[in-house]
Amino acid sequence: MTEKNISEHGISARSRANLLEAMHGEAFAFAKYKLFAKQARLHGDNELGNLFDKTADQEYMEHFTEQADLVQLAGTDEQDVTDAISGESFEVDTLYKRFAEEARADGDEQVAHRFEEIRRDEAFHQLAFQEALIKLQTRDRTMKGSMGRSAKAHDF
């Protein structure tokens, strides 16, 4: 592997892209299997519900989290909140707005309404993360200013 193929995460760009795609699949499988587990239990099949739950947990706890570690998905709290704001902003400003418009243009009013409802929820998420970022930044400035240094774990 040549140096120009190595990303800032120490892996090739193609491997990183493959890991991210795999993570999307694992996350979707987790959510889908949790839904299937609930449905199986509603139909009286606890054994099948347990199988779906067990598989869902493995998809998340092993596959997704191990892949997330390889791509260094999580960073500092401030980085993670900034990433969350970016994702929520995209959903509010672009994704769900476009989806609602397209559904309405196709005559799928119920789908358009659902996308608009979700868009409003995402706007609340966006605001909550923006407020969290302000608190993080204020806390960090206060801690650095009052101690004259960054706080360490042994300080608490």
Positions of PLM-derived features:
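Non-heme di-metal
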Residues: 2-156
